From Swiss-Prot:
DNA-binding region per UniProt: 1-192
Protein name as catalogued: Nuclear factor 1
Recorded family membership: Belongs to the CTF/NF-I family.
Gene Ontology CC entries for this record: nucleus
Gene behind the chain: NFI
Signal sequence annotation: none
Localization terms from the record: Nucleus
PROSITE patterns xrefs: CTF_NFI_1 (PS00349), CTF_NFI_2 (PS51080)
Biased amino acid composition, Basic and acidic residues: 188-202
Record region (Disordered): 188-231
GO MF assignments: DNA-binding transcription factor activity, RNA polymerase II-specific; RNA polymerase II cis-regulatory region sequence-specific DNA binding
Keyword terms, alphabetized: Activator, DNA replication, DNA-binding, Nucleus, Transcription, Transcription regulation
The keyword Cytoplasm belongs to this UniProt entry's keyword annotation: no
């Protein structure tokens, strides 16, 4: 069993994709698990200080531990991607080929499969959600599946897990929060502007990257870094 897992972890598919996994992903998945565990034990949410302490602990984890986690998760994803799509997926992520649809194996109802992303996990995540977190560094909850939007060129929106075909719908509240946080830092210049926040919301929407929600960038700037495993 151990030797098989080791071989899986060093599969060419995994070796090619590993440098493109966002460093943020390890912290995000583990932080969500810690928060759920804390809530079940204490019947209350973590305070901001407690959450920050856990986040700092996870950020300081050894690179070898993060690499082991990413390798195991990529091994799971490989098995859930249809064999005929695996090579094209690697070529698209590594920038060697234009991204096309990458079909996943459906569940028993013909819908998107869900997987656990941690050992002994109490939560399963949709494959397309996992792909967006891993390769685009967008912090999404396991319940955010309805916020994912497939691109117009995606020919198989039900089963496609190509991250380049997946965007995130921006909610009005997201835009307002992005505007509010930004305006607090620019309080002086913000005086005299309308109180309804519509102009700020418009600017927040225009300044964000396509397909990403406002809070995605606000929650963790580490989402823009990749796991190069070189520090």
């Amino acid at each position: 069993m151990g030797s098989r897992l080791t071989q899986d972890e060093f599969h060419p598919f995994i070796e090619a994709l590993l440098p493109h996994v966002r460093a943020f992903a390890y912290t995000w998945f583990n932080l969500q698990a810690r928060k759920r565990k804390y809530f079940k034990k204490h019947e209350k949410r973590m305070s901001k200080d407690e959450e920050r302490a856990v986040k700092d602990e996870l950020l300081g984890e050894k690179a070898e531990v993060k690499q082991k986690w990413a390798s195991r998760l990529l091994a799971k994803l490989r098995k859930d991607i249809r064999p005929e799509c695996r090579e094209d997926f690697v070529l698209a992520i590594t920038g060697k080929k234009a991204p096309g649809c990458v079909l996943s194996n459906p569940d028993q109802k013909g819908k998107m499969r869900r997987i656990d992303c941690l050992r002994q996990a109490d939560k399963v995540w949709r494959l397309d959600l996992v792909m967006v977190i891993l390769f685009k560094g967008i912090p999404l909850e396991s319940t955010d599946g309805e916020r994912l939007v497939k691109a117009a060129q995606c020919g198989h929106p039900v089963l496609c897990v190509q991250p380049h075909h997946i965007g995130v719908a921006v909610k009005e509240l997201d835009l307002y929060l992005a505007y509010f946080v930004r305006e607090r830092g620019e309080a002086g210049r913000a005086r005299g502007r309308g109180s309804d926040g519509r102009e700020g919301m418009r600017r927040a929407s225009q300044s964000g990257r396509p397909g990403e929600s406002g809070p995605a960038g606000l929650r963790d700037q580490a989402g823009t870094r990749s796991l190069g495993w070189a520090g």
